[in-house]
Amino acid sequence: RSEEDILKEISGAIDSGVTNIRIGGATDIYTYRAEGVRDLEYPVPNPDPISKVLYGAREDERLNILHVDNGNPSIVAENIEPSTEITKSMIDTLSDGAVLSFGLESADPTVHEMNWLNCDSEQLKIAIRHINDFGRVRGERGLPKLLPGLNFIAGLNGETKHSYDMNMKLLNDLRSEGMWLRRINIRQVEGQGFQEISESDFRSFKKKVRENIDKPL
């Protein structure tokens, strides 16, 4: 969709009385109108179009909350310079308390390979550090402007009990580095063609995350 089309929809929503808007419905805000979306493993972000949408939305004084949805950490990690321009635009325009959801799904390299996941743990760490570098500044409501959210999926092919250990190690590494996360989402995979999960291992992992990572953060 064009920038003009998105801004027209936002304007129409505001005309109808909407004051809080999240720009969603996309898997990665950094690849909006990016270079090589169909051809490159890591498309190169194009800062101008998304900046036009964000600043254009903010021009309407009736708009209260402006948030975004998802980001692909591998795109950020492999394209730091253009990603930084986009991140700065988000910091300038988004309401504080915004979350950029990162879908790692699993820290297990075997699971990553078997399920064609598009981000590995090292790329995730780079992206989380990047968002923390800019997003921890507090806004008008006293909340950090932009923090990463992290998504895990249980039940992907190749998963074992040790996959959860790798997930925990990643989270403990991030905590040791002093990284901030807004929230950690843990869910089970849906659909056919995936393996059964160990309910006890899954529940144990969720409990460890909530008690050892979520609460301290």
Question: For each predicted feature, which ranges?
Answer:
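Auxiliary Fe-S-binding modules of radical SAM enzymes
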Residues: 61, 135-143, 165-217
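Canonical Radical SAM [4Fe-4S] cluster-binding loop centered on the CxxxCxxC motif
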Residues: 1-5
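Conserved SAM/AdoMet-binding glycine-rich loop
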Residues: 7-149, 154-159
